[in-house]
């Protein structure tokens, strides 16, 4: 055995014995000073071999001995805090990995609040704030040859990353703020940067090193859900350091390459979220997606196809990263193909939420913006096939946003694969989502860090607007200036007062018909367009003024209006036709409702006419369920769907007559003498009137349920006509709600729940929304006692289905409607229990 090594062992053993037994301050300080020589930084250093043996073999034992002696009395043996400072220096100046593990071991083994526990926690706080964690990671980056080194590193890794949880469990309410996760992980990110700077210095000096431990620290932190805290500090500094240094770029590439496979997704997601631009992401990741299969799967599939919660700038940064290098651009083309394949899948359209479809559409548009003309021409046929399939299944959707997505993406794709041909144009609402999607189709200018030319910029999609050139519009509004003294100035009429023509009315040769039969004749046989238009515009008011005459020809008039086509350009033709049809239905509800419901399942009707029937039934039912003073507004049009009964509108014609002067004086005097502590909005009570819809609700409701499962030659509710089925479910829900507290509400509710149960697993989102609304309507309209007495089995079945929808449905609106229905069920149960409980 080497005598020098044996001497170190003997010295350490003797020192531990003295520290354990002696109470003499001078003796203790002398012993600690002797041991401090092995850590360096003294005037009398030891041999390098002795220093290495002490650090690798004996240092942990010395630290444990120092921890065991920690007490207020032991530290006060030396006045002035000299012993305490010397005691702390062993933890702060020695090998950081062993000091850190001994500190963590001591804190975890100390039970309950105590002086030793808080002193060790404060020392650990000092250890962190003085940069010792960076020194710890720097030490792990050096080459290691010990057999036990992997196990030691694993222990060290778990303690470094799990420090906030471990300290929180040990200190509980006495925990220090530095150990909170929101404070610790940004500090750890700063320490990672310092460790990487040391690695760069090693490489510049020609020394060998590894960033594997730092990669594992980063991966474990991201797996535990703290990637935002650590990367918010790490990424901005690496962005600056890698801007002008290829060595720093290589270190960053190596850092992410050595992240364990189980942590690749978390690290990549965090980096993509934190990187401000594609060039920054390219400097941090390099060609990782080309070398690493797991990284390629995460970037090209998981972040784009399986997840959809990421922001639009993140998608742009991710796809821009793929477009910046020639080795990665084939992956961009592959991503576009896979996105379009998913976008064109009818099953995906039915079973994925709208948010995910919008996310995929944005990714497609960003891909198209990054690809050049030659690259797109190579895959032109595949793009065209996917586009046609996607447009077809989206235009068949019942949801307007889904249809709009199909139109916009199809316009952009067609403009890119056929730039020389006629542009494909659709008519859709110009809302915020449409503008955002069209903006994504135009690529941003390539940055200076782009390593590959992106080819010719794609032509922006032609978004036709009413005003093409603002300058031309200005020119058309402002007359051209004329030189002074011109003839136009002499002939000007500006000094004359303009004639008021605001009250002028258009003179018509045909007068408005005065009788219902004249209107029917004019609408069916008249060739005079002015008379036809006048009949249509005056029909609604005439129906309300002549109810008896209307009932004589109500069915005939409803038939004429249902089949009426626009012969000439009439403003608001559809609204006028619908208002007149609603007025006829309100005037003679039983006969007209029988006719309309029988025609809903009839042959040779368009989908538009069938949906018109449903709209008219709902509007008429809404009008019948209101007081007459609200529904008979012959001069102001029919009731608008969704309009609530307002007390101000319920005042009758007689109630609106001006009061006499003496009554006004008396009321004013009373009002001035009255002291009021609070005053609400003035309201007039509505006079009680019967609900006219209650007697005819069955004629509106039950015929619509009879043949929904019987396909016709041109009409199949359970097949392709899902839009009409969705409108039918919403119509039935509205009729059920308007039949509240009526005698027919119970059989209506039972029939509606059976209808819902038959269609509860329908794939169309719009249909499921209507079914869920129908359940809520039943719960609101049928009395509680009748619900639980007549429909207990149906409610139990509906409850289990609602719970399943609230948890698993892909559509957010469906989940929300299911939760509301469940809350209504709970409220009904609580109401029943409170009413059945004995009163004290």
UniProtKB/Swiss-Prot annotation:
One Gene Ontology cellular component: nuclear body
Sites bearing N-acetylmethionine, chain numbering: 1
Superkingdom, taxonomy of origin: Eukaryota
Biased composition (Acidic residues): 488-497
GO aspect biological process, one term: protein stabilization
Modifications the protein undergoes after translation, according to the UniProt entry: Hydroxylation by PHD3 is required for a proper interaction with ATR, and activation of the ATR/CHK1/p53 pathway following DNA damage.
Primary location class: cytoplasm
Pfam assignment, any one: Telomere_reg-2
Family: Belongs to the TEL2 family.
Residues covered by region (Disordered): 443-497
Effect caused by changing residue 407 to E: Does not inhibit interaction with TTI1 or TTI2. Inhibits weakly interaction with TTI1 or TTI2. Inhibits interaction with TTI1 or TTI2
Function: Regulator of the DNA damage response (DDR). Part of the TTT complex that is required to stabilize protein levels of the phosphatidylinositol 3-kinase-related protein kinase (PIKK) family proteins. The TTT complex is involved in the cellular resistance to DNA damage stresses, like ionizing radiation (IR), ultraviolet (UV) and mitomycin C (MMC). Together with the TTT complex and HSP90 may participate in the proper folding of newly synthesized PIKKs.
Annotated site (Interaction with PIH1D1): 491-493
Record's subunit section: Component of the TTT complex composed of TELO2, TTI1 and TTI2. Interacts with ATM, ATR, MTOR, PRKDC, RUVBL2, TTI1, TTI2, SMG1 and TRRAP. Component of the mTORC1 and mTORC2 complexes. Interacts (phosphorylated form) with PIH1D1. Interaction with PIH1D1 mediates interaction of TELO2 with the R2TP complex composed of RUVBL1, RUVBL2, PIH1D1, and RPAP3.
Hydroxyproline: modified positions: 374, 419, 422
Sites bearing Phosphoserine, chain numbering: 457, 486, 488, 492, 837
Gene Ontology MF annotations: Hsp90 protein binding; kinase binding; molecular adaptor activity; protein kinase binding; protein-containing complex binding; protein-containing complex stabilizing activity
Alphabetized InterPro entries for the sequence: TEL2_C_sf (IPR038528), TEL2_Regulation (IPR051970), Telomere_length_regulation_dom (IPR019337)
Keywords: Acetylation, Chromosome, Cytoplasm, Hydroxylation, Membrane, Nucleus, Phosphoprotein, Telomere, Ubl conjugation
Protein's name according to its UniProt entry: Telomere length regulation protein TEL2 homolog
Annotated localization: Cytoplasm; Membrane; Nucleus; Chromosome, Telomere
